[in-house]
Amino acid sequence: MSAEKSHLCPLFWQHHEEETVLREELQRMKENGIGGFIVEARPHPDYLEENWWKDLTILLDEAKKLDMEMWIFDDGDYPSGKANGLLVKKYPELTKRYMAVQSIDALGPAKSRSVLIDAWLRPEEELLCVLAGKRIDHKDRFDGDTLIDLSDYVKNGILYWDIPEGEWRIFVIKVTKNGGEEWTKDYLNPCDPEGTRAYLDLIYEEHYRHFKDEFGKTIKGFFTDEPRFGNCQGYDKNIGSDMVLPWSKTLLAELSEYGMGAMKRYLPALWFDCGEKTPDVRYAYMDTVSRRFQKYFVGQLGDWCRAHQVRLIGHVVEENGAHARLGYGSGHYFRSMDGMDTAGIDVVNNIYPGRTEGNFWTAFNNYDTTFNHWGVSKMASSSANLDAKKQGNSICEAFGAYGWSEGLKAMKWITDAMCVRGINHIVPHAFSPAKFPDPDCPPHFYARGQNPQFRAFHQWSAYTNRVCDRISGGKHIAPAAVLYHAEAEWGGKYRPFEEVVKLLMQNQIDCEVVWSDILTDREKSSMKDGMLQINSESFRVLVVPYAEYLPHGLTERLRELAEEGLPVIFLKDYPKRSYFGSEFIPRDGMLRCDEETLIPLLESLNIKDIIPLEKKEHLAYYHYRKGSIDRYFFVNEGLTDTISVQIRFHDNREACFYDPMSGELLKAEQRVFLSGEEEGREVKLLLRPYESIFVVFGENTEACVENRKMKETIGWNILGLPESGWSMESSSYDTYPAFKAVEEHTLCDLSAPDKMPDFSGTIRYRLHFDGAEAREAVLSLGEVYETAIVWLNGQKVGEAICPPYRFYLPEGSFLPGENEIVVEVINTLEKAHHENPFDRYWVQEPTGLLGPIEILWK
């Protein structure tokens, strides 16, 4: 296995399996480059009871033997927050509470009218206030200046009121435990500290009581999964939607601190358009509840962990922009990450190979690729790189709930999509020791030995560890900062940060996502030599996605930065005004442009870190510096076109390549270039679909070997192997390594209805052919579905988990006279096991070796 430190820590599901099964699963993980695991009840029949502690003791013992890290999933089910049902049983008063509104429409003038108020209150609900406002144009719009508090006119549950002239609406606002997300109704109130304290006592303290001697040693910490407000179901629950709202006992007092006096009378603006003050009220509310989530939920969990010598990792719900909203969201991604020791996300069913534009359906949602492909990973790595306490560490829970159609090929592509945006630790979802096939969100990687591709899993894990190791422990280099949009979204029209990130990355301009809190903290952000400094990073420009409104402190900070020499670029237009503030007036150093002119503007500012000599929108890169070594990770994100391009680097040292698939340093074709007074290197890059490479400056280039990966074979001799005449054998996933003959001798799709449509496992192909005298030769298998292992004349040539299925043939392996080639092709389990809701969302691929197969030689 690779010598790099393991950056893989999968979820390991527990259902109270036999001891031998648990130990075997851990052994298979360790053998395949996995250095840790997260124990998750999924579900465990005796969670927090005797058999749970027994199973954890077994896992802890085996982890110590294997020198593996152990993490503990912090609840009996996901999302985190119910303490396996104990919270509502022991502390029902600490479960979630909401603020709800009921509406009664009234016409005036009308004297001596009364309205039943208590009739709107269910048992255990509390009346907060009764307000009224005048309607505009017979619609659900209200004149904010007419909002009035009528609470003092409520006597014995009845409102007595002389209704003024016009159309009015009476708002009955109450505190309730009803109306939120049904799934999480018994979870702790994330806005109050008492619920989290009880949760810690029930889960964290109980694990500490049993295993405190291993805390900070083998047990490294807790994983918290998708904590949320849960005031309703959905990803798109912006403030202003028809829903109950998160509530805490001190909420009204905190809202009043925003400079609007008795904020209570403006509460209808949280649901309805109440004129000019609506953006301010909504911002104040979201700012308050997201800070309470930050401090009293995730922050309190993290503080407990660090006080007990362990760490807190995990993630919230990010998909489709939920990270900045209520519902499934936590209000503000960067605030929810503040208490964690790593910045986390998940990529579960929401990034697919080649899907980089538009929307697509999955078993969970209609996913937005602009966020899920371009934005989510960059959001996490930015938190990791800019929040000093995270020390550059980000994690992604990945690969789960795709169905068995997802094999190592898709995993490699998804890994590249995450890592080229800075993710450097991966939580594979999942290892399940349950009886095969476990229907719970496949794929499962070992699957009690039934996953045929696990034979090649070590290829993916070694590759991933090499990539992650080379983007860890140093610092990211990016020329641009892009403002996070949550505060803009809360109150007005806006554009999300990921649209800017996408535009920049398609033009090879890397960036970090920066957020208001870190920008306005002058101890964490400053100007030096005309550049914005945050943590160890320096930015030459700040891009602000369109925002109708921004917080006053942020707009003041943007003015300061511009005045100190930082180009601050506003897309589309400047803000209309700040929240609770006056009209926004731009300063010198502030620029305005549209999307079409952003890239030319940035190029005119001479900020680019690398300069491709041709436009290649599918070429993604990530620059990472560790000590004196600079590494540029390049990925071809296209599925069909080879990228061949010259790239200029602002570094005059000799460059080389590092191939993370083979672990080799390779020679690079390059030349020195002069541009004005600058001397740099121009390096030729060739990447086929699914390929990646590091361009490295500062390595000992004497250790480089011949670069066979990028060798051009134009003009070489071509020997095409025939489509027919092959002998074939098959070994099903559940009978391997026993093979039997296949009644087929021609390369074709073996999943055709008249052949082997339900087959999952290994197909062995064998052919004898005449060779030639060759100094060099390259074998190309053409189309393969999907993992290939190749032998030539009894010598193993290599294995490949994804395209391009090209193998360099060592001198002497391709001979004149008779040669024998053997190819084993392993498909995924979806042909035999697609009885789940996930595989039906994939367009199924063929099975087997399709070719054309060629040997290129000279």
What would you call each of these model-derived segments?
Residues I647, F769-N793, A800, I821-E824:
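Aromatic-lined ligand-binding clefts that engage carbohydrates, nucleic acids, or primary amines
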Residues S692-G698, A777, L815-N827:
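Short, well-structured beta-strand segments enriched in hydrophobic/aromatic residues
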Residues N178-G180, T701-A703, I826-H833:
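Short acidic/polar inter-strand loop motif in beta-rich domains
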Residues H833-K858:
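Exposed low-complexity, polar/acidic, P/S/T/G-rich flexible segments that act as propeptides
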Residues E40-D152, N156, D162, V172-R197, ...:
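Acidic/aromatic-lined carbohydrate-recognition and catalytic surfaces
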Residues S6-E24, G35-E40, Y47-S80, N84-G85, ...:
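Carbohydrate-binding surfaces of carbohydrate-active enzymes
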Residues P803, L809-G812, G817:
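Glycine-centered tight-turn motifs at strand-turn-strand junctions
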